[in-house]
Regions:
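Nucleic-acid substrate recognition interfaces
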Residues: 1-369
């Protein structure tokens, strides 16, 4: 194939992208062959939708005459020429306000929803907090279906400094209303002409995930948290039952990934704990809870106490993090002594908030002795 007057830097970028795709395919194929799996063989995908990079000085220049403009080198069908384009004023103000002085990479062309955009990337080095475990303040987060997120600010001794219920009911109502329209349309006309409606519902769900992640990170920063603790929700499997659509739309991994990016930029760390029995076990150690049949957010403990199930789970999430971090650096003899006095901390899937309070008390007594 001949590419008339194609710049050498664009040609090199295309060649490197192709080599990277081939190398990735070979690596994935070797790993697949080692596992002896019958299905899921990697495929060499040719349509990678690679977009060109506008290298600075040779393809991209900032416009000296217009504050919110730029000059791009484009091919007009005959020759490569410089064209002046106007950029969004609000976007450029955001970049000038938040990313001035940071190391900027070359902008990349991006196509979304049949429109083209310039994606600007910046590099920033942020030191993460190194606060000792006993001095840490954490924000334990329970992501749920009924309430979007329940956050608890906690110290290592179990002291609760703050609690917050994060929910966006109007956004969820809007999305479910769109899903209802899709369902009614599909019953009448089939599923052939609802692609745009599903795309709209997906965008609403993505925006909901952004708002939840921003609210969680903002609350953690407001309370000077060192670590944001989540449940490990990377499990995969077939989903069935009445709540199948709700579970498919639940963007738990996307929310955690967005929180991780935002927290790292603010200097906070992210940690995950085992999710087993965090909601099933009561935080006070009384045993399993019984959820209300009409309102799954509320539950009854074995001792008759009525409580919010998601709030109890957020206590247990924070407790499991501190139990793990407090026991990890101890010598084996000291750890065995503490586990003998608090047997429930041996199995992490059965640890609750009451076990953290008891463990911390035993550690203080052992240190005093």
């Amino acid at each position: 194939l001949r590419f008339p007057k194609m710049p050498s830097y664009l040609r090199r970028a295309a060649i490197q992208h192709a080599l990277g795709s081939i190398s990735s395919y070979k690596t994935r194929l070797e790993l697949w062959e080692k596992t002896d799996q019958k299905g899921g063989r990697p495929k060499l995908v040719c349509d990678n939708h690679a977009m060109p990079v506008f290298y600075r000085d040779v393809m991209y220049r900032e416009d000296t005459e217009e504050k919110d403009g730029a000059c791009l080198k484009l091919y007009d069908g005959h020759d490569w020429k410089w064209f002046r384009v106007s950029l969004s004023h609000t976007d450029m103000e955001y970049l000038r306000k938040n990313w001035a002085g940071k190391k900027a990479a070359a902008p990349v062309l991006e196509k979304r929803h049949r429109k083209y955009f310039l994606r600007f990337s910046y590099t920033e080095e942020v030191p993460l907090t190194k606060t000792p475990v006993k001095e840490q303040i954490i924000c334990s987060v329970d992501l749920g279906l009924n309430t979007d997120a329940v956050c608890t600010i906690m110290r290592s001794d179990g002291t609760v400094l703050g609690r917050k219920f994060i929910d966006f009911p109007s956004e969820k109502d809007r999305m479910y209303r769109v899903l209802g329209r899709i369902s009614r349309f599909q019953r009448k006309h089939g599923s052939a002409q609802v692609k745009s409606r599903w795309a709209y519902a997906k965008r609403l769900n993505t925006e909901l995930g952004r708002k939840i992640a921003g609210a969680v990170t903002g609350y953690a920063e407001e309370n000077h948290a060192d670590v944001i603790v989540f449940e490990y929700l990377e499990t995969k499997g077939k989903i069935s039952g009445r709540k199948k659509q709700k579970l498919h739309l639940w963007r738990k991994r996307d929310i955690q990934k967005r929180c991780e990016h935002q927290a790292h930029r603010r200097g906070m760390r992210i940690s995950r704990i085992c999710a087993w029995n965090t909601s099933r076990l009561a935080y006070d150690g009384s045993g399993t809870v019984v959820r209300d049949p009409g309102n799954h957010s509320l539950c009854t403990f074995q001792n008759g106490k009525r409580y919010n199930c998601d709030l109890s789970a957020s206590y247990n999430i924070g407790a499991r993090y501190f139990i793990r971090e407090l026991l990890k650096p101890l010598p084996v003899t000291e750890r065995s002594l503490l586990e003998a006095k608090v047997p429930s901390v041996k199995r992490r899937i059965s640890c609750v908030y009451a076990d953290l309070r008891e463990l911390f008390s035993e550690m203080e007594l052992l240190r005093a002795a």
